[in-house]
């Protein structure tokens, strides 16, 4: 079994950091449903400003609020307006990787959904993997590559 990405809220902005709450991250149910994130599910959080990485669990806030609130100890790692990535995962046998279609949701500064993307992995007859990022119409997008200084 391998731990693989199941869904992501990419670039969602922190709306509040509440040190005195019990812990967790509070998210708009609309956003969670778009990415396939469940209430009480453990997620990884990566702060794009500070590089901080934490793990916590999801609680649902008010539907339509576009909230993203870091609670308890997690509030020390993120400040309001920080763009973060919230990622859930799944354990899956490698033989089933081509059936996994993680849902990726991107956001504007006010946490309105910009894009609904998915990831796709295929395997050829020689056992080599290929990877694609697909838009809502299942059309592949360009994948950024690290290019050395030419």
Swiss-Prot record:
UniProt main location, coarse: cytoplasm
Gene Ontology MF, one: aspartate 1-decarboxylase activity
Location of this chain's protein in the cell: Cytoplasm
Active site, renumbered: 24 (schiff-base intermediate with substrate), 57 (proton donor)
Details of cofactor binding: Binds 1 pyruvoyl group covalently per subunit.
Annotated positions binding substrate: 56, 72-74
Sequence positions bearing Pyruvic acid (Ser): 24
Listed cofactors: pyruvate
GO biological process: alanine biosynthetic process; pantothenate biosynthetic process
This protein's pathway: Cofactor biosynthesis; (R)-pantothenate biosynthesis; beta-alanine from L-aspartate: step 1/1
Segments passing through the bilayer: none
Keywords, sorted A to Z: Autocatalytic cleavage, Cytoplasm, Decarboxylase, Lyase, Pantothenate biosynthesis, Pyruvate, Schiff base, Zymogen
Modification comment: Is synthesized initially as an inactive proenzyme, which is activated by self-cleavage at a specific serine bond to produce a beta-subunit with a hydroxyl group at its C-terminus and an alpha-subunit with a pyruvoyl group at its N-terminus.
Family to which the UniProt record says this protein belongs: Belongs to the PanD family.
PANTHER family, sorted: ASPARTATE 1-DECARBOXYLASE (PTHR21012:SF0)
Job description of the protein: Catalyzes the pyruvoyl-dependent decarboxylation of aspartate to produce beta-alanine.
Quaternary structure and partners: Heterooctamer of four alpha and four beta subunits.
Protein name: Aspartate 1-decarboxylase 1
This protein's encoding gene: panD1
């Amino acid at each position: 079994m391998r731990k693989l990405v199941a869904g992501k809220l990419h670039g969602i902005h922190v709306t509040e950091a509440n040190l005195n709450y019990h812990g967790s991250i509070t998210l708009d149910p609309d956003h969670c449903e778009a990415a396939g994130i469940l209430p009480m599910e453990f997620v990884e959080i990566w702060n794009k400003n500070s590089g901080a990485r934490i793990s916590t669990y999801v609680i649902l806030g008010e539907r339509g609020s576009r909230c993203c609130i870091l609670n308890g100890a997690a509030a020390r790692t993120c400040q309001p307006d920080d763009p973060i990535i919230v990622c859930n995962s799944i354990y899956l046998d490698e033989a089933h990787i081509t059936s996994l279609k993680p849902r990726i949701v991107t956001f504007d500064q006010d946490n309105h959904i910009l894009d609904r993307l998915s990831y796709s992995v295929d395997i050829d007859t020689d056992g080599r993997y290929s990877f694609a990022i697909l838009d809502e119409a299942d059309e592949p997008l360009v994948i950024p590559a690290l290019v050395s200084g030419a």
